[in-house]
Regions:
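Intrinsic-disorder/low-complexity, polar/charged segments enriched in Ser/Thr/Lys/Arg/Asp/Glu/Gln
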Residues: 1-7, 13, 48, 61, ...
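Hydrophobic/aromatic beta-strand elements that line small-molecule binding cavities or substrate pockets
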Residues: 6, 53, 62-68, 79, ...
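A short, structured loop/turn motif at beta-sheet edges
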Residues: 12-13, 40-43, 67-72, 92-101
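Short glycine/serine/proline-enriched coil/turn segments at secondary-structure junctions
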Residues: 43, 56-58, 83-85
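Short beta-strand segments that buttress and anchor functional surface loops
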Residues: 48-54, 75-82
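Short, cysteine-centered beta-strand-loop-beta hairpins and adjacent loop/turn segments enriched
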Residues: 54-60, 110-113
Length: 152
């Protein structure tokens, strides 16, 4: 089990806007190489991101599914990269003044990570998830806010 926290210098809504755009996942999720498709209903429960993980040309095609979500507060995912395994990943957002405390928790549910002791698995997951939250923060803090185009 890995649990990593970071304070992001923007609002929960801005962080959620990154989480809610499935096409952005390879920009901030360490190990995600590309997105092949995103269900139109993302990030609703049951929606999937169809991704590839690894380094080209050694890529694994699989998906990540939303198990639970509360817009602006929480998303719980089932991330797959078979035969490497599956994991449950929870990302929670808590307002902290004008900032957001973000916590990512990851727990392997199948594959090698599920049978190895946490003392073996956690250091690598923690290292990866520190970088994942760093990348998420860069996007949420610095991505321009787009205004709707005039319809008139």
């Amino acid at each position: 089990m890995s649990s990593v926290a970071r304070t992001v210098r923007t609002t929960p809504d801005r962080v959620w806007s990154v989480l809610a755009d499935g096409w952005l996942y390879p920009l901030w999720v360490v190990g995600a190489a590309r997105i092949r498709d995103v269900d139109d209903t993302w990030p609703e429960v049951g929606a999937r991101i169809h991704h590839s993980v690894g380094i080209w040309p050694a890529l694994i095609n699989d998906d990540t599914e939303v198990l639970e979500q509360q817009p602006g507060q929480l998303i719980r995912l089932r991330a797959s990269a078979w035969p490497l395994g599956q994991a449950h990943v929870e990302i929670s957002l808590t307002a902290n003044g004008s900032h957001t405390d973000v916590v990512i928790e990851e727990h392997a549910t199948s594959g090698p990570g599920a049978v190895l002791p946490d003392v073996v698995v956690a250091p690598g997951l923690n290292w990866r998830n520190v970088e994942t939250l760093r990348r998420l923060a860069f996007i949420a803090e610095k991505r321009p806010i787009r205004q709707p185009a005039d319809q008139g």
